[in-house]
């Protein structure tokens, strides 16, 4: 069952509050971010795992490279093990407990729209870059979703847009190859991420877009 135009569906995770709304068009501006809900040729939903967690990236942006880290403990569960080790190395006092060795920062593939690009050209470029040129697009879906995400950890709001993207590659074509992209460390099936905090709303996004092809 889908949502009608402008109807809003809300999801909440320990970190995020996400509003999902179906819209007619994606606005074109320098701040527009577009993402693809990618479906493989054999029907699997794809998701990317970032090389760096958003929490660690935010900490780095606020710190001098030689400084002692000041880190809220509520951020620790949203970081990679190697990032936690780096924080522990710089701790003046305290310790890090309850590390989740299986944490991954899941994201939809896509990025920021260039002013000279169409929406679909932007997605083709981003998918090519983030997959080390392994992903090629067969066709795009017709439904557009607006995602409004409030990051409760940093009290910031992000707006992005998403559409389905059916690709020519199978899951096996993509899952057994290394990726050297600066942002993405791995591309995998969303079906393998059922224990992730983001799984529920990411699954909803895929179901909305795919079933409305």
UniProtKB/Swiss-Prot annotation:
GO MF term set: hydrolase activity; metal ion binding
Cofactor: Mg(2+); Mn(2+)
Domain called Nudix hydrolase: residue spans: 30-209
Motif interval(s): Nudix box: 111-132
Residue sites binding Mg(2+) per the record: 117, 126, 130, 151, 183
E.C. number: 3.1.3.-
Induction: Expressed in the early phase of the viral replicative cycle.
Keywords: Hydrolase, Magnesium, Manganese, Metal-binding
Reactions the enzyme catalyzes: a 5'-end (N(7)-methyl 5'-triphosphoguanosine)-guanosine in mRNA + H2O = a 5'-end phospho-guanosine in mRNA + N(7)-methyl-GDP + 2 H(+)
Annotated N(7)-methyl-GTP binding sites: 16, 50, 151
SUPFAM superfamilies assigned to the protein according to its UniProt record, in alphabetical order: Nudix
Enzyme class: hydrolase
UniProt keyword Manganese, yes or no: yes
PROSITE patterns named among the record's database cross-references: NUDIX, NUDIX_BOX
Pfam families found in the cross-reference section: NUDIX
Domain of life according to the entry: Viruses
Residue numbers annotated as active site: 126
Family: Belongs to the Nudix hydrolase family.
Primary role: Decapping enzyme that remove the protective 5'-cap from both host and viral mRNAs to commit transcripts for decay by the cellular exonuclease XRN1. Accelerates viral and cellular mRNA turnover to eliminate competing host mRNAs and allow stage-specific synthesis of viral proteins. Acceleration of the turnover of cellular transcripts may even promote the shutoff of host protein synthesis.
Name recorded for this polypeptide: mRNA-decapping protein OPG121
Species in which this protein is naturally found: Vaccinia virus (strain Copenhagen)
Lineage: Viruses, Varidnaviria, Bamfordvirae, Nucleocytoviricota, Pokkesviricetes
Gene coding for it: OPG121
């Amino acid at each position: 069952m889908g949502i009608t135009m402008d109807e809003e569906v809300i999801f909440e995770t320990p970190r995020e509050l996400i509003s999902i709304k179906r819209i007619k068009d994606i606005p074109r501006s320098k701040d527009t971010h577009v993402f693809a809900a990618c479906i493989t040729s054999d029907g699997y939903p794809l998701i990317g795992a970032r090389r760096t967690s958003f929490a660690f990236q935010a900490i780095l942006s606020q710190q001098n490279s030689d400084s002692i880290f000041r880190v809220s403990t509520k951020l620790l569960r949203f970081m990679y093990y190697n990032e936690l080790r780096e924080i522990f190395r710089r701790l003046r006092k305290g310790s890090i407990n309850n590390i989740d060795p299986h944490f991954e920062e899941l994201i939809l593939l896509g990025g920021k729209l260039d002013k000279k690009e169409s929406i679909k050209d932007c997605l083709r470029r981003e998918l090519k870059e983030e997959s080390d040129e392994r992903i090629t697009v067969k066709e795009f879906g017709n439904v557009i979703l607006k995602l409004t995400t409030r990051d409760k950890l940093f009290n910031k709001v992000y707006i992005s847009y998403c559409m389905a993207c059916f690709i020519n590659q199978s899951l096996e074509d993509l899952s057994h190859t290394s990726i050297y992209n600066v942002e993405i460390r791995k591309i995998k099936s969303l079906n393998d991420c059922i224990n992730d905090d983001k799984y529920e709303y990411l699954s909803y996004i895929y179901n909305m877009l795919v079933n409305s092809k």
